[in-house]
Regions:
Chain D
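Alpha-helical transmembrane segments of multi-pass membrane proteins predominantly involved
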Residues: 2-225
Length: 314, 686, 492, 225
């Protein structure tokens, strides 16, 4: 198998374009659900353009790490996105790495995000990085175990092959292992994308914010790439969920029609998932930091059960 | 392969060994003339290591999977002792590691040891540095148990002398003693293990030990395995035998710490591999299970304790425990695969472990050298007094950052590759056995994930608190960049990190002889998917990864930000301004996040393990609501130290004190002893 | 030429000469010359024994086999080193005013007598004479221990002489019983032959019960003199209170000489009763001594007592090695004797230097950081300590490993494991204690030693020999030790 | 039995047994007696018995060299040593042993037990001893009780005396077991050794007395551990 430049370009464009849309949708629907008017769906695009144009203010204490962090976050999220099958079973970069590489890349992005938070010497940034690293650390085992559950049934960590395997196996979703893995991954998704009940993307209250705290000192295009990278990461994780657990609808052949169809269904699936996220965010309150581990360990247990059930039902 | 090739490497090795000796002697002779001693000692060690490197690499490249015949270094004049060495793939691989580090560390030491000239006797430092390298190389080359043990003990002895180099501090002395005692106990176990083999084969030769286990009674075989596991485990610093490691590694001079964390603890891995794959024959299942479990526990606990440290070098030492654990996961899985007769998977897991061995050697040495440079610049190991060094020593900061990324197993660097291989082998291990045991694989995989994430957290803390933000103390404020040779030493290791990360397939060919020797499988061909730049899990459709590809793609994608900048932000300016300080006039360093604070969430989450306790002293003038000064200190309890080692030590002292009463000084009592002995023997005789 | 008799006579002569002169230098000179000559003669004897097997003189009054030759070598070497060290040592004591010229002369006289007695022990053919010689060494060494005439040294000497002569009385019983056995049930007009060379041939015909009883008494008696636990109680006192040269002699050879006497009985018993009885006793008490020594080392507060306990541990190891009674273990044990004889005096010499610099042997007083005050002494002491704790590249590592692997080869696994455990325990103790005092920064500022090279020749000589023989055991010496091991193991 | 015996061996044997028994009795007296000078005299008597035994052996068995032993014992152990010790005692004017560890009755009891033990140990060898009955048993008993005496007494002098009684026991054993005693050279060696030993002990006792102002050896407990 070899690389299709066209596919790469296409998927890159898709990620760049779709990511702000998803966050916009979620913000908007959440507002609606809470009887507010809320920002328009395309608000994130406007924000990005605005940020890109603005001057950059850099802290006097910050070093070069501060300025490269946003680009690392952006690029890692983007290249991670190229390993996920979105429209076709065959992800453009599945040859360059599967689930493990994807997790690794996202972790690399987080690494620099946290460093960027520490660099301006403000207490908030440090607090944010500390919490971010803690939560991701305890989210990691659940994530890995869930991935393992899927990968074991497919026999590979290559997401395209996993998708393909599930594609052939008709309607795998009923498999309890997958249900539990899905649930686990959903919780991890909430944690990784900084959603209620783990984090509150809307707040700027010092003591509760996590992701925002790290971005506090960023401005201008640096902030733009930070935000954009975050939303791309969110899109990537969501598309893993939707495409690995409901793979039936990925485009089988290369015809334009098939692509179009796949794209539509993909967007629908995303909207469905976003709706779920919105509901969860609305009906739940943010957890205290030290209650978060309980939630994530619940995810871990779910994934472990899923694994156990693959073991039992084979 | 060209004939006489082994001869070549043999010659190179001999030259190297002789050079080490020359280095030892010359630096002892020149100890009065500090700088000259430094030049000679580290010059010789560097050249010697270079010779060794060429020899071992040529050997591995030529791919001798079968050992070349042993030869005597120098004729022994003592019966039963033969100073004979042989080069085989495993030994050559580890020899390559020690030589590689030897080169980089010697370069680094030129600048580093200068700092001691006049203050301490650098001649001693150089001499024992050479001896240590020499002994370690011989450990990997020794061909019989007697010689192996001699080299092993000399290694321990010189390491002890290096650890207690700055013996003026009490902490250093006690650490050295603890290290030497535990290592000696370990050596005792090794002696017993080897003697069990000797009992079975009536010989000391490693040749005759090969696959000896199959001819031994199972009980003795298992006993030997356990003895070796203990003996080599002490050296490798597995939990719960690790307590000496975070004590001894930090107090040594940094180039020595790098050597110890990089290579010396790897001798334990070497021994374990040698014994369990070469000597003891087909392993029963519980060996693999034990090693895998120990590995997992060591990995998780190691990184957890590392997170609690704010002493930079102790933090790194704890990470050595973690990485030893990861290596052992690979070895344990390999043993289990051997038991279930999956040689290819065994080869995969083994190469994962060995790959991580060399990776850890490189980036841990790199990090210790960085820490050494920081120590050299700030004269403190306490991270709470550092900060802002990225501006004052940018190159060191860059090297340290790369090391940190590598040890956190982040792509595209070498740590990621070896852990990726470990994941692959664990993943495929699930299918190898129908029994419930197979759940161990994914679970330890999850623990490995936890370890990786915690390591990332820990190094965000290590790098962030040490190098970023503003300086927390005067030391840190007037820090300066390290001299050239120290930077060069770090640079070499950084380059190796990148190479090992970006060209794994090419490197794995060097491992072929080893896997061929130990598992009978050649791997590198199975590990390349299509192009030579893509690494693949061995299974028919295992995952693939290409660090090089990822890097290139990322570079291509970075055109997007550039383009966007050109489109929107060409005219935007960059302003430097103060960080928002909540309305305070200026941002005080005290307002920064501290290392202790950074790791507090983890400390709270795992409080069952850490049993943290804190002391807060606050002073105020007129009302407790307006505190003038506040002093906070948090401690965690090291369970093994407080629950196992300290009580045992107390018990020993108590017994000994009690026994002194026997020698109370009264001659009557002494006469009674003799009298009773006489009566006893009279009864015994009649 | 009368080799053996001259070996015994020369020290006596030097003793006589020493009693005449006053000058310290001359005294030291005499003894050095004498013992250098002894060493030469010892090598001569070594060659003769290798060729002839057995050398005897004065119609077999003197009698030397491989075992005796080996012992002669050890005694000569240690005595030479001691006399090299003693001269300078006492000159410093004299300068410090702790000792009078008369006492110094007394030391040199008694020291020569001490050595002469030991030579006689190993060369005497008649067991009675052997006993007599051993008693002579005991008396000489008692006066040496009491040389400083301090309260503590008198106390030590008193305990030493009481326990020692009691033990020797028991040994005398053993001798009598053996003689009775030699006489046999049928008394005859002519005196029976009480020579070793005769006894060993008729051993199998001797009365078994008498020999057994004799061995029990010999074991307790000579065991007391050799410092086997629990009869060892005099040992740390005497070693710590004697002047350092004497401590070196006591621990370096005197203990081993007593052990030699015990071995003679052991051989007789094995010939008569088989190996089991005496072997078991040696092994059991050897192990007991080792395990007793370790805790005392760990909590010791006095430097020379520490070293004394380490000697106890080594003697125990040697006994155990011989008690295991396989060719390999006995060979290892005899080799260990040699290496230990070369190692331990160095430690005592170093302790002497430390004592004279710090005017105390209490570890607390010597405190941390001796290395800053006496760099060279500490360096040599460190080497010797590494050797004594059985670290390579020194020979004791080799001999210890030989004994233990011999045990394994003979399937005496448990015993060997116990031996190893005891060795490790002792190692831990010595390492902890010596690190505590030698390394570190001194508490109080001591004047850096004026004469750093004091005692270095003696220590250098021994350490050099040790290192040499650690990497190079000449074939002839190996042959000698093997023969000695054969004699001990009962292979005629 | 091809031993050429002229005078009636029974008589000799009887006499020897008698003397040996007397030695034992004297030993018991030593155990209970606390006056030092008396102790010394008792020891002298014991030694006298020993030399008597030697003489008897020499007379009844034509072992001319045993006369020498007898003579030496007489000179040395009956006259010289007691004289020496007397001088020592007068010099450091101490008249009697302080309270021993065990009081008189208990020590008698202990010695009785030790005698029993001596007999048990010696029983297998009754066939071996040529002269007298149970002389070997008595010799071993002398050893054990002497040992006990050393443990029980605290004055340096009386410990020396106890040691000397042990030596007597050895001599007795030598005579009893081995017809003609040991070879002369050995006897001489042993004898002079004992002499020297006692002198050394004397010197030490004197020095101890000087520097400790006492002879109580149970006070010598500086060296511990």
């Amino acid at each position: 198998m070899n690389l299709h430049p066209l596919a790469i370009l296409l998927q890159t464009g898709l990620l760049l374009a779709l990511a702000p849309f998803v966050s916009g949708v979620i913000k908007n629907w959440k507002a609606k659900l809470q009887n507010r008017r809320g920002p328009p769906i395309w608000q994130p695009y406007l924000d990005l353009i605005k940020f890109l144009g603005k001057d950059v203010v850099i802290s006097e204490h910050a070093s070069w790490v501060f300025s490269i962090a946003p680009y690392v976050v952006f690029l890692t999220a983007l290249s991670a996105g190229l390993m996920v099958p979105i429209l076709t079973v065959q992800a453009p970069l599945s040859l360059f790495g599967g689930a493990l590489a994807l997790i690794g890349l996202l972790a690399l992005g987080r690494f620099f995000l946290a460093l960027g938070g520490l660099d301006p010497a403000s207490a908030f940034g440090g607090m944010g990085s500390s919490r971010e690293m803690t939560i991701s650390a305890i989210a990691e085992p659940a994530l890995m175990l869930a991935i393992f559950t899927v990968a074991i049934t497919a026999g590979t960590t290559d997401l395209s092959r996993v998708a393909a395997a599930l594609h052939e196996a008709n309607w795998q979703l009923l498999n309890p292992a997958h249900l539990m893995a899905f649930a686990a991954l959903f919780i991890v998704l909430l944690a990784e994308t900084g959603r209620v009940p783990i984090d509150n993307p809307a707040t700027h209250l010092e003591l509760t914010m996590i992701h925002e705290a790290m971005l506090l000192e960023y401005s201008g295009r640096l902030l733009a790439f930070m935000e954009w990278g975050a939303s791309i990461k969110q899109l990537v994780l969501m598309s893993i969920l939707v495409n690995l657990f409901l793979p039936g609808t990925l485009a089988a052949d290369g015809t334009v029609a098939a692509f179009g169809l796949a794209f539509l269904i993909f967007v629908l699936k995303l909207l469905g998932l976003s709706a779920a996220v919105v509901v969860v965010e609305t009906v739940n309150a943010k957890l205290r930091l030290f209650r978060v581990p309980d939630l994530l360990s619940a995810a871990f247990v779910l994934a472990a059960l899923g694994l156990l059930s693959t073991f039992l039902f084979q | 392969m060209p004939p006489g090739f082994p001869l070549m490497s043999a010659i190179f090795i001999n030259v190297g060994l002789i050079l080490f000796l020359v280095g030892t002697v010359s630096s002892l002779v020149l100890q009065r003339r500090g700088n000259l001693a430094v030049a000679f000692a580290f010059g010789c060690s560097g050249l010697a290591a270079l010779c060794g490197l060429t020899a071992f690499i040529t050997f591995l490249v030529a791919g001798f999977s079968r050992p070349i015949p042993a030869y005597e270094l120098f004729p022994s004049l003592v019966p039963n002792v033969h100073f004979s060495v042989r080069i085989d793939a495993l030994g050559a691989f580890f020899g390559m590691i020690v030589s590689l580090l030897g080169v980089a560390l010697s370069v680094y030491s030129f600048g580093y040891a200068k700092a001691f000239v006049g203050r301490k006797n650098v001649g001693i430092l150089g001499a024992f540095f050479n001896t240590l390298l020499l002994a370690t190389t011989l450990v990997f080359l020794a061909d019989n148990a007697f010689f192996f043990l001699i080299a092993w003990e000399i290694m321990a002895l010189s390491a002890y002398c290096l650890v207690s180099f700055e013996h003026e501090h009490d902490e250093t002395r006690s650490a050295g003693v603890l290290y030497f005692i535990m290592s000696h106990i370990g050596t005792g176990c090794l002696i017993l293990g080897f003697l069990l083999l000797f009992q079975a084969s009536q010989s000391y030769g490693f040749e005759t030990f090969h696959a000896l286990g199959d001819r031994m009674p199972p009980a003795k075989r298992d006993a030997a395995f356990l003895l070796f596991l203990f003996g080599f485990g002490v050296k490798a610093g597995i939990v719960p035998l690790h307590t000496w490691l975070p004590a001894a590694h930090p107090v040594a001079p940094s180039n020595v710490s790098a050597l110890m964390s990089g290579v010396i603890i790897k001798t334990g891995i070497y021994g374990l591999t040698r014994v369990s794959f070469d000597f003891l024959g087909a392993p029963p299942n519980w060996w693999g299970v034990t090693v895998l479990t120990i590995g997992t526990i060591s990995a998780v606990l190691g990184v957890l304790y590392a997170l609690m440290e704010h002493d930079l070098k102790r933090l790194l030492a704890y990470h050595s425990i973690e990485n030893i654990g990861i290596i052992l996961m690979g070895l344990g899985a390999a043993l289990m695969f051997l038991h279930t007769h999956h040689p290819v998977l065994a080869a995969l897991a083994l190469s994962a472990g060995l790959y991580h061995t060399i990776n850890h050697a490189v980036f841990k040495a790199l990090l210790f050298l960085g820490a050494g440079a920081v120590l050299h610049a700030t004269h403190t190991r306490n991270m709470e007094e550092m900060g802002g060094l990225a501006k004052r020593m940018p190159k060191t900061a860059l090297f340290f950052l790369i090391g940190a990324v590598a040890i956190s197993a982040l792509p595209p660097l070498n740590g990621f590759v070896s852990e990726w291989l470990t994941y692959q082998s664990l993943l495929q291990g699930f299918g190898t056995t129908p029994s419930l045991i197979r759940l161990m694989f994914p679970l330890s995989g999850a623990m490995l994930a936890l370890t990786g994430a915690l390591a990332a957290a820990c190094f965000v803390k290590a790098f962030g608190i040490t190098f970023l933000a503003q300086a927390r103390s005067q030391h840190a404020r007037d820090a300066h960049e390290a001299p050239f040779s120290m930077l060069l030493g770090q640079g070499i290791l950084t380059a190796v990190c990148l190479l090992l990360g970006l060209f794994p397939v090419q490197f794995l060919t060097l491992l072929d002889p080893v896997t061929k020797q130990l598992t009978g499988e050649v791997l590198s061909s199975k590990l390349t998917a299509g192009s030579a730049w893509v690494l693949s899990g061995t299974a028919p459709q295992g995952g693939t990864v290409s660090t090089l590809g990822i890097t290139l793609i990322a570079l291509c994608l970075s055109s997007i930000p550039v383009a966007l900048w050109w489109l929107f932000a060409r005219r935007s300016r960059k302003r430097i301004d103060a960080t928002w300080a909540c309305g305070q006039p200026i941002l005080q360093p005290q307002m920064e996040y501290t290392a202790t604070g950074f790791s507090k969430p983890i400390r709270m989450i795992f409080k069952a393990l850490f049993r943290p306790h804190r002391e807060v002293q606050r002073e105020y003038d007129y009302s407790p609501y307006f505190t003038t000064t506040i002093r906070f200190s948090a401690h965690v309890e090291e369970v093994f130290e407080t629950r196992i080692y300290r009580p045992f030590r107390r018990w020993v002292w108590w017994i000994s004190r009690r026994m002194r009463a026997l020698q109370a000084g009264s001659i009557q009592a002494y006469l009674i002893y003799i009298f009773l002995t006489l009566l006893l023997l009279l009864f015994f005789a009649l | 030429m009368l080799l053996l008799s001259s070996i015994v006579m020369i020290p006596l002569a030097s003793a006589a000469l020493c009693s005449l002169v006053r000058s310290h230098r001359v005294l030291a000179g005499f003894t050095i010359v004498a013992f250098a000559a002894e060493l030469a003669l010892g090598l001569q004897l070594f060659r003769r024994v290798l060729t002839a097997g057995v050398v005897s003189e004065w119609n077999e009054f003197f009698h030397a086999d491989a075992l005796s030759a080996w012992m002669v070598l050890l005694i000569a070497a240690v005595s030479l080193a001691t006399s090299l060290y003693a001269g300078r040592y006492f000159r410093r004591d004299f300068a410090a005013g702790v000792i009078t010229t008369g006492r110094i002369r007394q030391f040199f006289v008694l020291n020569s007598l001490f050595a002469a007695g030991m030579f006689l022990v190993v060369l005497a053919n008649n067991l009675g004479v052997m006993w007599f010689a051993l008693e002579a060494t005991a008396l000489a060494s008692v006066l040496l221990v009491a040389l400083y005439n301090r309260k503590t040294s008198l106390e030590a000497a008193w305990k030493y002489v009481m326990l020692g002569s009691l033990g020797l009385a028991l040994a005398l019983f053993a001798t009598v019983f053996t003689y009775a056995a030699a006489v046999g049930p049928h008394p005859s007009e002519r005196l029976p032959n009480f020579n070793w060379s005769h006894l060993i041939n008729v051993a199998p015909q001797l009365d078994r019960r008498l020999i057994k009883l004799a061995f029990v008494f010999a074991f307790v008696g000579y065991g007391t003199k050799a410092g086997l636990a629990p009869m060892h109680t005099w040992l740390p006192d005497a070693h710590s209170e004697a002047p350092s040269p004497t401590s070196a002699m006591l621990s370096g050879v005197s203990l081993k000489i007593a052990l030699y006497a015990l071995l003679r009985f052991h051989i007789l018993t094995t010939q008569c009763l088989g190996t089991h009885f005496s072997g078991t006793l040696l092994l059991g008490f050897g192990l007991f001594s080792m395990f007793l020594a370790a805790p005392f080392i760990l909590v010791q507060t006095n430097l020379k007592r520490l070293l004394a306990y380490s000697s106890l541990e080594h003697i125990g190891f040697i006994c155990a090695g011989i008690g295991m009674n396989t060719p390999l273990t006995i060979f290892g044990a005899l080799l260990h004797m040699g290496y230990h004889a070369l190692t331990k005096p160095v430690l005592f010499f170093a302790a002497g230097n430390i004592h004279q610099t710090f005017h105390s042997l209490e570890l607390r007083v010597i405190g941390p950081g001796v290395v800053k005050v006496l760099p060279i002494t500490v360096c040599l002491m460190g080497l010797a300590a590494a050797a004594a704790t059985g670290l390579p590249p020194f020979g004791l590592f080799y001999s210890e490993l030989t004994v233990i692997s011999g045990g394994f080869a003979a399937r005496q696994t448990i015993t060997s494991v116990l031996l190893l455990v005891a060795l490790i325990a002792a190692f831990c103790g010595i390492l902890t204690q010596l690190t505590r005092i030698l390394l570190g920064a001194p508490k109080v500022e001591h004047s850096n030693d004026s004469k750093p090279w004091d005692g270095v020749p003696a220590m250098g000589l021994l350490l050099g020999a040790l290192l040499l023989f650690s990497v190079w055991l000449p074939g002839s010496m190996l042959q000698l030790i093997h023969r000695a091991a054969g004699i001990v193991g009962g292979i005629p | 039995m091809n031993t050429p015996i002229t005078a009636s061996p029974e008589l000799g044997s009887q006499l020897i047994t008698l003397c040996a028994a007397v030695m034992l009795v004297l030993q018991f007296l030593l155990v209970v007696q606390r006056m030092l000078l008396t102790n010394i005299r008792l020891f002298a008597l014991q030694s006298l018995m020993l030399s008597a035994i030697a003489t008897i052996v020499a007379a009844f068995y034509h072992a001319s060299h045993v006369y020498v032993v007898a003579g030496l014992t007489l000179v040395g152990k009956v006259f010289f040593l007691p004289w020496l010790l007397n001088r020592l005692v007068r010099r450091i004017n101490i008249t009697q042993e302080i309270e021993p560890l065990l009081n008189a009755p208990t020590s008698m009891l202990a010695c009785g037990g030790l005698t029993l033990l001596g007999y048990i140990v010696a029983r297998p060898f009754t066939t071996l001893q040529k002269l007298g009955n149970n002389t070997l048993a008595i010799a071993i008993t002398l050893l054990l009780t002497g040992f006990f005496l050393m443990i029980n007494r605290r004055k340096a002098i009386s410990q020396v005396l106890a040691l000397l009684t042990v030596e007597n026991g050895v001599m007795l054993a030598a005579v009893a077991l081995t017809t003609y005693g040991m070879p002369l050279v050995v006897e001489l060696g042993i004898f002079f050794d004992v002499m020297v030993a006692v002198m050394v002990l004397g010197i030490l006792v004197y020095r101890i007395r000087e520097s400790f102002a006492s002879m109580d050896t149970s006070k010598l407990t500086q060296l511990r551990g």
